[in-house]
Amino acid sequence: MVSSKELPPSTVPFFPNQFFRNQFRSKPQYPPPNTNLSEKVAIISGGNTGLGFEAATQLLSFKLGTLILAVRSTAKGEAAASKLRARYPKATIHVWKLDMSSYDSIQEFAGRVNTQLPRLDMVILNAGVSKLEFGTVSSTGHEETVQINYLSTALLAILLLPALKSKSPPGIPGRLTIVSAALTLVAKFPNRDESPLLPSFDNPKYWDPNDQYCSSKLLMHLFLWKLVDYISADDVIVNLADPGFVKGTELARDVSGGQRVGLSIFASLTGRNKKHGASTYVDAVVNKGKESHGGFIMSWQIHPYPTLLYTSEGQQITERLWDETLAEFEFANVRGIIESMKGN
């Protein structure tokens, strides 16, 4: 199969064409019924609610051996784990603290993976936010949506790469799926010409709640385009998965009033159910092979990246974003980690 980079950019309008095709004409793809994950170890961030919890349920239904729910609230995580343990008593289920708004917490979590897990097969980075009001994370000064959806997720992904490479069985690549969104295809990205780029997302003059969410997900596309040049699909398969528009999730938990009512009505008419939405994660991390490395999976199919990435402008932005992101993470030796992934 052809990878996302090798596909030509799509010329089909997202609204209404691709949106309604995604929501009503796409067929979910589940692992074969005899799939056995009994020896495997998986991590899901934000796995205590919504699509993360549903993805956990689906993996456990295929006899997943060990599951780690990476959650901000361990109390809520344990409540979710109790439900899963009751349903799947043969599985080993742990709850580990992970605060995606804290670089210290992210580093502590990755360190725990390195020291406490003898094996790691798959990771689904599902935690994300969609903020209605502008706000910043006190410890970093960055706007919350970009901090959680892009910066913190990118840092965690990089820190987990060595474990996915070294702790998966010989000859079997580790799997890393980062949850994305089809809305990247319509991101306006009004601050794309700013230099430096990342601080411009912290400027309220560019703030729009809808586009900030879209742009935060687009940043991960730009970053992954470059990152996979350093990672062999023989070591770790890294991809992006879009769950589609799903009803009943907590992504829009900060939405209130009339917007919440309108969104609920629209979701009831067009939204996928959680089972179908979460199956996109499971498909990406279990079904898809090396052809999905560095790819964007939308509606269970490998899809082109947003058009911007195929342009000279997009490539220039990618290089700027790459340099600024690695500089942001200098404290965590990410350059050394990324370089180490190129070795045998």
UniProtKB/Swiss-Prot annotation:
InterPro entries: NAD(P)-bd_dom_sf, SDR_fam
Active site: Y213, K217
Pfam families the UniProt entry points to: adh_short
Binding site for NADP(+): L51, K76, D99, N126, Y213, K217
Domain of life: Eukaryota
EC number: 1.1.1.-
Keywords: NADP, Oxidoreductase
Family: Belongs to the short-chain dehydrogenases/reductases (SDR) family.
Known role: Short chain dehydrogenase/reductase; part of the gene cluster that mediates the biosynthesis of the phthalide-terpenoid hybrid 11'-O-desmethylfendlerol. MfmJ seems not to be involved directly in the biosynthesis of 11'-O-desmethylfendlerol and its role has still to be determined. The biosynthesis of 11'-O-desmethylfendlerol begins with the NR-PKS mfmB that forms 3,5-dimethylorsellinic acid (DMOA), which is then transformed into the phthalide 5,7-dihydroxy-4-(hydroxymethyl)-6-methylphthalide by the cytochrome P450 monooxygenase mfmA and the hydrolase mfmC.
Protein name in UniProt: Short chain dehydrogenase/reductase mfmJ
Classification lineage: Eukaryota, Fungi, Dikarya, Ascomycota, Pezizomycotina
